[in-house]
């Protein structure tokens, strides 16, 4: 079983315009929810996530998100892709 570790950063700037700016900068907006904690908006590096999705185990394995130095165990619940480009739009993660 593969061990997936992705670096993430909390994001304060929310909304459609902010998400578009992130995507142009090579980032993916994402949300982490579940458990007893509040939902957290984060951003991830597009190329690293896209490369991870090439491994089929990514979608069924536990993923470790390193959010500003703090480790969080999650699974991927949703991944939105661009209709015709090889580009990711948004990701939803659920805490384990």
Curated annotation (Swiss-Prot):
One of its GO terms (biological process) is translation. Pfam families: Ribosomal_L25p. One of its GO terms (cellular component) is cytosolic large ribosomal subunit. It comes from the Bacteria. This is one of the proteins that binds to the 5S RNA in the ribosome where it forms part of the central protuberance. Part of the 50S ribosomal subunit; part of the 5S rRNA/L5/L18/L25 subcomplex. Contacts the 5S rRNA. Binds to the 5S rRNA independently of L5 and L18. Belongs to the bacterial ribosomal protein bL25 family. This is Large ribosomal subunit protein bL25. It comes from Francisella tularensis subsp. holarctica (strain LVS).
């Amino acid at each position: 079983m593969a061990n997936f570790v992705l670096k993430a950063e909390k994001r304060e700037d929310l909304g459609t315009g902010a998400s578009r700016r992130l995507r142009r900068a090579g980032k993916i907006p994402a949300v982490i929810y579940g458990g007893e904690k509040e939902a957290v908006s984060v951003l991830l590096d597009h190329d690293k996530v896209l490369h991870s999705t090439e491994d089929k185990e990514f979608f069924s394995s536990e993923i470790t998100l390193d959010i500003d130095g703090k480790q969080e165990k999650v699974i991927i619940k949703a991944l939105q892709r661009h209709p015709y480009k090889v580009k990711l739009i948004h990701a939803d993660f659920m805490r384990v």
